[in-house]
From Swiss-Prot:
Residue ranges of the TM segments: none
GO cellular component: collagen trimer; extracellular region
Superkingdom: Eukaryota
Protein name: Protein HP-25 homolog 1
Annotated ranges, domain Collagen-like: 40-76
Keyword Secreted: yes
Length: 212
């Protein structure tokens, strides 16, 4: 019968397929056993290979945290500065000036701590070489004056003033560079008779600006 033949054919094909799968599995097991029998024992470790080439530089990492504050350093050496040289004076006169061409001798010493001004002669003697400032201030009433600022007998500057029935002022100053032993003074340029008229008050002073 045709239907019976189809079922027999299908059963034959299925049986063949199962038989083929069994054969393949058997062959695989045999091959695996043969490979296992061919492998020998593990050999010794070989020498290390050559180093590989260096890789490219990596990316820059983030900035690290600030470090701890270091210990304070040792204190520095303390040195004493030498004292600066000093030289100054201030003197005052109330009354007539002496005759001409001689130093004016002042009656009152306002300042002369270094002793560089000689009150007896009216002369400043330079003991500290350097740059000095000298000046004078004169107040007049019914009188006339003419004075010269002198250095070693040479006039540096002069000043003339007259006053009637009112008070007048006359002043002058100069900056001089002196060497040790130089002498500075203020002297009158009028005769004594002219100087004795009226009332005169004068202050003469000087001080060191910068020592050499």
């Amino acid at each position: 019968m045709p239907g019976g033949r189809r079922r027999v054919g299908s059963m034959n094909i299925a049986g063949f397929w199962i038989l083929a799968q069994f054969v393949l599995l058997l062959v695989a097991n045999v091959k695996s056993s043969a490979d296992s029998e061919l492998c020998g024992p593990r050999g010794a470790r070989g020498p290390p290979g050559l180093s590989g080439l260096p890789g490219p530089p990596g990316y820059t990492g983030p900035i690290g945290m600030p470090g701890l504050t270091g210990r304070p350093g040792l204190p520095g050496l303390v040195e004493k500065c030498p004292p600066l040289p000093q030289s100054a004076f201030s003197v005052k006169l109330s009354g007539p000036f002496p005759g001409p061409s001689q130093p004016i001798v002042f009656q009152e010493v306002l300042y002369n701590h270094q002793g560089h001004f000689d009150p007896a002669t009216g002369v400043f003697n330079c003991s500290v070489p350097g740059v000095y400032h000298f000046g004078f201030d004169i107040e007049l009433f019914q009188s006339a004056v003419k004075v010269g600022l002198m250095r070693n007998g040479i006039q540096i500057r002069d000043k003339r003033a007259e006053a009637g029935d009112s008070h007048e002022q006359a002043s002058g100053s100069s900056v001089l560079e002196l060497e040790k032993g130089d002498r500075v003074w203020l002297e009158s340029k009028l005769d004594r008779e002219e100087s004795e008229k009226g009332t005169t008050h004068a202050v003469f002073y000087g001080f060191l600006l910068n020592g050499n």
